[in-house]
Regions:
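Short, low-complexity cationic-aromatic patches
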Residues: 63-67, 80, 89-91, 135, ...
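Short peripheral tails and domain-boundary helices/loops at the edges of structured domains
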Residues: 150-163, 340-355
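Conserved short histidine dyad/triad with adjacent acidic residue
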Residues: 54-60, 73-92, 249-255, 268-283
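Conserved hydrophobic/aromatic beta-strand scaffold that supports enzyme active sites
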Residues: 55, 72-76, 98, 114, ...
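A structural feature that tracks compact, well-ordered secondary-structure segments
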Residues: 73-75, 267-271, 280, 296-298, ...
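A short beta-strand-loop-beta hairpin characteristic of the jelly-roll/cupin
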Residues: 82-87, 92-119, 129, 277, ...
Length: 357
């Protein structure tokens, strides 16, 4: 029995209040996480860890970064070999991937098609397409790669199938069709059941908005697979076209608006002439920079970070940032962002500060 005027808390009240306050406080806690996340990865650290290894993670939530979309690493393998000793298929994954070749020349087999590359070229690997890389040069092939692995893992749809580890395959071991499909599970059912099953006549549902929406859902996988195979894959470095923007000279590389079938990640290269500076801006998406040439510094929020060729910068979400070239040669910066993802969910905002020289 309670005292007059007092109220008894409903069962589970404290738990619900705690969970609600976790949501209310999330934004401020996220700011703290961004402030604690590493920003600058110097080349010396990368070289030290890369020695004796064929790959090193540079930006990843599992090594202390507050990255929710982008994973970035450096990879390499010896002359005359295939990466990871792959011999037939390589691997595939339900993440977007963009590769930039730093050193060497060779070719890749991606979804059964050969693409020849050399230093300075880019590869945009379609989601869930088997791919493997062959080094034809007389030196190590070295590349940096950016993928959307953290996002796929975070929402529970990450699938990585590697020819060396068939015991972990989820779909590839079932039959040849599953190995060729770019849509996980798409060919598990008979042909007549895929998309809109044959026994269903869409005409019987004319005028039904709900049915139209559902039929679009049934057709989506087939359209998605076709779009992945039609998307661009190879970009030659010699074909980059730098154009002037408020942020400076920029060459877009991989973008959904340029014929690439990407929905999460975009890639560009920025160029800053000696003694010049980029524009300043901030945006509500992740960004990872890798310095391809030059030396200088960046102001990220109120902190200064010195950089040179081979360094990496992980720009915290919604942090003001600007780059300065204090060297004698043009600075070129490889930029990967999660902008398309934020546009697709309606949370994209970019704010311009100082305009580039």
């Amino acid at each position: 029995m309670t005292e007059k005027g007092s109220q008894t808390k409903p069962s589970g009240y404290d738990d619900y209040l705690r969970m609600y306050m976790e949501m209310v406080s999330f934004a401020k806690e996220e700011l703290k996480r961004r402030e604690k996340s590493p920003v600058h990865i110097p080349r010396e650290k990368i070289d030290r860890e890369f020695a004796g290894h064929n790959w090193v993670l540079l930006v990843d939530p599992r090594i202390g970064f507050n990255s929710r979309i982008i994973r970035f690493w450096i990879n390499g393998f010896p002359p005359g070999e295939e990466e990871n000793q792959w011999k037939s298929m390589g691997h595939r994954h339900t993440v977007e991937a963009v590769i930039y070749v730093l050193k060497g020349h060779g070719y890749s087999i991606i979804d059964g098609i050969r693409y020849d590359w050399e230093a300075g070229d880019f590869l945009c690997v379609p989601v869930f397409a088997w791919h493997r890389h062959i080094n034809l040069s007389d030196e190590d092939m070295v590349y940096v790669a950016s993928t959307t692995g953290p996002l796929s893992m975070g929402i529970g749809v990450a699938i990585y199938e590697d020819e060396r580890y068939p015991e972990y395959w989820v779909f590839a071991q079932k039959d040849t069709a599953e190995k060729k499909s770019l849509i996980p599970g798409a060919v598990e059912i008979p042909d007549v059941q895929r998309g809109i099953p044959q026994e269903i006549n869409p005409a019987q549902y004319d005028g039904s908005t709900a049915a139209k929406l559902y039929f679009d859902q049934l057709r989506f996988a087939e359209g998605e697979e076709e779009a992945r195979r039609k998307g661009k894959v190879l970009v030659k470095g010699k074909d980059l076209k730098f154009e002037k923007t408020p942020m400076g000279w920029v060459a877009p590389v991989v973008d959904p608006k340029l014929g690439f079938h990407v929905k999460v990640m975009s890639t560009l290269v920025a160029r800053i002439e000696p003694g010049k500076r980029s524009g300043a801006h901030r945006h509500l998406y992740e960004e990872v920079n890798h310095i391809l040439s030059g030396e200088g510094y960046s102001i990220i929020e109120d902190k200064r970070y010195e950089w040179k060729k081979g360094d990496t910068l992980a720009i915290p979400v919604f942090s003001w940032h600007q780059h300065f070239n204090r060297g004698k040669e043009p600075a070129r910066i490889l930029v990967h962002t999660g902008r398309p993802a934020m546009e697709n969910i309606g949370l994209m905002i970019t704010q311009q500060g100082e305009v580039a020289d």
